[in-house]
Structure formats: C-alpha cells, structure tokens
Amino acid sequence: MIPPSYIGRFAPSPSGSLHFGSLVAALGSYLRAHSQQGQWLVRIEDIDPPREVPGASDNILRTLDAYGLHWHGTVLFQQQRYQVYQDQIEAFIASDLAYYCQCTRKIIQTSGGVYDGRCGRLQPRLTHGAIRIRNHVKVDHFVDKLQGPVVVDKAFAEEDFIIKRSDGLYAYQLAVVLDDAYQGITEVVRGCDLLEASCRQISLFTQLEFTPPDWLHLPLVCAEKGFKLSKQNYAPAIDVIHPQASINAALTFLGQKAVDVDSVEVMLKQAVEQFDLSTIPAQKEIVLSTIND
C-alpha cells in the first residue's frame, strides 16, 4: 500500500468540551487533509492532568463523531507516550544537549524577561528542576501557508526553552514535536495562538534531525479583539444534536461557501469538494460579530 503523501491532524486538549473555535480548527484541518486526498488523524494532548476535565476526552471524540469528522486509524493519547518523552530527555542530558534549571519567573523577569542560559553554565551541573534544551538551532522566521512570512523576536528565538517542567510534567513543545514526527504529520493546521511557538518546534525538529512539517495557521475565533474563545474562558460547547448550523457557520468563518443542509457526512463531502484555501482570511484573529458585517 502506498502511504498517503499528506497527513494532517487535530490535537485538542481534554480541558473541556469543544467550542466553536475548536470546531473551526477541526474542520479547517479536516477539509485541508481531505482536499489533498490525505489522512486526518486525531490526537488527545493530555499531558497536563491538572487542567483536564474528567470525561472530556470521550466527550471530544463523541462530538467529532456527531459532526461527521471521522478520523483515520486510532486516536493517539499523549499519556501513552510518556516513556518516549522521558527517553528523549535523558538522551539530551547524556549528550549535554539539555540541562536542569532552577530559575523562577521572577528571576527571569528581573534579568530582562528572557532566560539567559545561566543554569546551563553552572559547574557542577544542577540535578533537579525544570529541564531546558540547549537551543543550538535558533529559528526566528518561517513561511506559513496562510499567514505568509512569520518573524519572531530574536531573543525569543535564541532562548533555551523548557522541555520538562519543574513539576515533572512534559512540556508541550517536546511532546508535540515527537508526536508529529512519530505520526508522520506533513502539515500542521491549527490556530494562530501557536504561530510563534512554531519557531521553537522547527528548532526541535531540526535538532532531532526530523523533517519539519509545513505550517498553516488559521485565524482565531474571538469574542472581542484579543480575547479568543477557549475552554478556559468558558466558551459554550457546540451543539451535538443539530450540528448542521454550526458546520455552515464554521465554513463561513473560514471563508468557504456554505453547503446544502443534509446529513453531516453529505455536508462534509460537499465542503471538501468546494474547499478553497485561497479564500480563508489571512488574519490572526476574527471577531465573531464582524463575520456578517
């Protein structure tokens, strides 16, 4: 069997129910993958147990199913991958490519707000604390398929960033890179809240000698300027009983033509057939009230 040339994914965290912003990200990545005759995977990013809501993972998967957003293969849960993350961290430390750091946010703020690598220069080495990667591949720009050229602050790009937190939890940057590489993701389609983080992920991909995926960052759904819909600010869950209206609303948000109201499977088939990347607004955020203005 010839492997697909395109593999995309939707990777929500189980911190609550899917809301309209989640639907936009899920639908955008689904349409992009299927328009490329590719695969669309689902991964549950459950590496932050204190923020998890009991039952949220099952609720998310049921909601995707109710919307006809059926995934290829089995769902990957990041908690299944803890040993992989730990093995990579230990390999980094053994090669002096990572080190322990005990600097607090207050210490970093008093030294200009950017971590200066001081713990990486200590002798003898620290043996506990957060763990930072030695950032030997400094990435301060990349080209996004929708947003175009993206440039981040040089100090941010050069910083040795955390790959395991001081509380023992694995950092998102490490987990997402190892998982995207493991699943063979060829393009990451997600919201613009992670636009700058892509530079750190490209850095990690390169240091690990993996080929970075392409990047396509969708505009964020905002209730008002600078205030995105999120589970943390109690954005309402999307309707799983009558999903058709929400599907067309999400298509409109993404600059796509509405589809005929039918079963969700028929609606998504039509949406894939008429999907046009060039009509998605190349904006970092869109306030909901302005869509039909």
UniProtKB/Swiss-Prot annotation:
Q: Please provide, in alphabetical order, the Gene Ontology terms of the cellular component aspect for this entry.
A: cytosol
Q: What class of enzyme is it?
A: ligase
> Which InterPro entries would you find in this protein's record?
Glu-Q_tRNA(Asp)_Synthase, Glu/Gln-tRNA-synth, Glu/Gln-tRNA-synth_Ib_cat-dom, GluQ/Sye, Rossmann-like_a/b/a_fold
Please list the cofactors this protein needs: Zn(2+)
Location of motif 'HIGH' region in this chain is 12-22
- EC code: 6.1.1.-
Determine if Ligase is one of this entry's keywords: yes
Which GO molecular function annotations are given, in alphabetical order?
ATP binding; glutamate-tRNA ligase activity; zinc ion binding
Kindly list the positions annotated as binding Zn(2+).
101, 103, 115, 119
Family to which the UniProt record says this protein belongs: Belongs to the class-I aminoacyl-tRNA synthetase family. GluQ subfamily.
User: HAMAP family per the record?
Assistant: Glu_Q_tRNA_synth
Protein's name according to its UniProt entry: Glutamyl-Q tRNA(Asp) synthetase
Q: Which organism is it from?
A: Shewanella frigidimarina (strain NCIMB 400)
Q: Which gene encodes it?
A: gluQ
